[in-house]
Structure formats: structure tokens, C-alpha cells
Amino acid sequence: MILFENVSKAYKVHRHMKPVFNNLNFRIDRGDAIGICGANGAGKSTLMRMLAGVEPQTGGRIIRTMSTSWPIGFTSAFQMGLTGADNARFIARIYDRDEDEVLAQVEDFAELGDYLYQPVRTYSTGMQARLAFGVSLTVDFECYLVDEVTGAGDVRFRSKSENALMERRERAALVMISHDPGTLQQYCTKGAVLYGGALTFFDSISEACEVHYGLQTLAR
């Protein structure tokens, strides 16, 4: 379970606090597959970092009783001066996994070749996403957070990523951000719309996408 109780978030901008969220109240349980819709700048990535526990809230309370991945695609989790392999080994130590086993899994899945042994700062955005996705799959989380990662790589790699994500969705919670409604509808059953600092949930991902695009149309 991940529970948000009256959670707010604000950033200090030029001596003033700029609110991002106000009084968010929701719960995510194991087995949920939730797609989050929102315009650029609405705070989707901030929300994902808060779900992961890497971004503190300004007010309210967040309770976590299940293990949660870092946001897949959130490459700031890596040490850019280290190689991809060293980052994988570091993650293995954090989660008490066998380092050689984790490295072998990442090498096989991410398909980075010799680049796996080069500093992450030399990677393209797509290569960083491959590494993030590959490393995340070496840990059995109870909730996976996905931020626009499945578009990385060629058709074959995307297909492999999709299959891996679908397999984990069967036994864990999934929270996904994507600008593509087709992707959200492929993976998610429920939806939420982030708009004006509020997060509104819908029983259907299709309904959430429809409301989101309706709001976007009105804003134009």
C-alpha cells in the first residue's frame, strides 16, 4: 500500500512558495494498474518521485507498506561518473542481491554492449533509459513506477520491454506516466488526471484519457 493523506508540495521560487499539489488523498494497492494523465508542467514527474520516496512532500503524510521502484526513466538515480556496470553493482548491494547475477541480467536485457562498461554520462537518453529499465527488472518490487521508458530502443527492444512490464503487472502494482493514451490503455485499467494541483481518479483509464484531452482542448 502507498497512502497519501492531505499531501501538498510546493517549491520556493524567488522567495515565494509555488504550489504544485494541494491536499492529495489517495491509496495504491498491490494489483492496481494506474495511468496518470496531465499536461506538461502539471507535476507528473514530481508526483512519481514522491511515490518513490525520493522527493519529500511539503505537508501531509505518505505511508508506504510495499517496496516501490525508482521511477523507471528517472536517470538522475544513476551516478553519471560511474559505468553502467558499476551502477548496476551498486543497486545490487543496496537491495542485497548478488552483484554478478544482477550485472548478467542487466547486460542481457539492456543490450548496451561495451557501453555498459563506459561512464553513464557518455550515454544517450535512450541508452540511459535502457539501463534504468534493465536494472529495475533485477529487483522484485511490489510497485513499479514507469515514466515514458518503453519507447526507448528499436522495435525488438520495445517489444521485450513491453512483455517484461506486462509480466510484472500481473503480480505487482503499476503506476505509469505517458503522453500516449494507447500506451496507458495497454498497461493500465484505472486512470487519474493531474490538473490544477489536484489528482482525480477514474475507474477506467479510457475515461481518464478522455477527461484529460477535454481539459487540454479547453485550455487552447
Predicted regions and their residues:
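Conserved H-loop
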Residues: D180-Y187
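Conserved beta-strand-loop-alpha-helix hinge in the C-terminal portion
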Residues: A198-R220
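Conserved structural motif at the start of ABC-family nucleotide-binding domains
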Residues: I2, P19-N23
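Conserved catalytic Walker-motif region of ABC-type ATPase nucleotide-binding domains
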Residues: F4-V7
